[in-house]
Amino acid sequence: MIIYKDIISGDEVLSDTYNIKTVDGVLYECDCRKYLKKTNEDFELEGANPSAEGGDDEGGAEGGEVMVHDIEDQFRLVWLKAEDGAKPPKDAFKGHLKTYMKKVLKALQDKGAPDETINEFKKGAPAAVNKILKNYDNYDVLMGESMDGDAMHILIDFREDGVTPYATLWKHGLEEMKV
């Protein structure tokens, strides 16, 4: 299995269990799923006496449910929700992308990436940035578990069918780790 880590923060953000497609040479896209996840669950050890553990005989309190993306849940990504005021405004996100592009380029150079890889990133990134900014209002924005503001922001939108969510990540902003 291959885990993809953000080269800036080191956060795990993707794995090869997703069907990953390269877009425009610089972006990865992968289809996701949305599902209801139970919240506030009380976990008990199998065979434990619930009353001795401070629980009740019915197996604990019932939790609520929240809709999550599988990639968000699997990699403990943090959703910057617009309704909570956490999603950055478009201008702020544009500034983040500018800084992020410089950091990715430096990281590629520091790790001795081949010239072809660096040139592919330099050539493809500006068009990808424009494409992302044009569609920014449609994206859900997520960050890695560390909440490193300089790291990659994972973008989630829906395919043309309006049902299938997909994540967009920067190909050159990831490093592979075999596990």
From Swiss-Prot:
Gene Ontology cellular component annotations, sorted alphabetically: cytoplasm; microtubule; nucleus
UniProt keyword Transmembrane helix present: no
UniProt-annotated location(s): Cytoplasm, Cytoskeleton
Domain TCTP as annotated: residue spans: 1-179
UniProt entry keywords in alphabetical sequence: Cytoplasm, Cytoskeleton, Microtubule, Protein biosynthesis, Stress response
Gene3D superfamilies recorded: Metal Binding Protein, Guanine Nucleotide Exchange Factor, Chain A
Primary localization class, coarse: cytoplasm
Gene Ontology molecular function: calcium ion binding
Record carries keyword NADP: no
Stimuli inducing this protein: Up-regulated when grown with elevated levels of potassium chloride.
GO-annotated biological processes: cellular response to osmotic stress; negative regulation of asexual sporulation resulting in formation of a cellular spore; positive regulation of cleistothecium development; sporocarp development involved in sexual reproduction; translation
Family matches, as InterPro entries: Mss4-like_sf, Mss4/transl-control_tumour, TCTP, Translation_control_tumour_CS, Translational_control_tumour_p
Function according to Swiss-Prot or TrEMBL: Involved in protein synthesis. Involved in microtubule stabilization. Involved in osmoadaptation.
Family the entry assigns: Belongs to the TCTP family.
Name of the protein in its database record: Translationally-controlled tumor protein homolog
Species in which this protein is naturally found: Emericella nidulans (strain FGSC A4 / ATCC 38163 / CBS 112.46 / NRRL 194 / M139) (Aspergillus nidulans)
Species classification: Eukaryota, Fungi, Dikarya, Ascomycota, Pezizomycotina
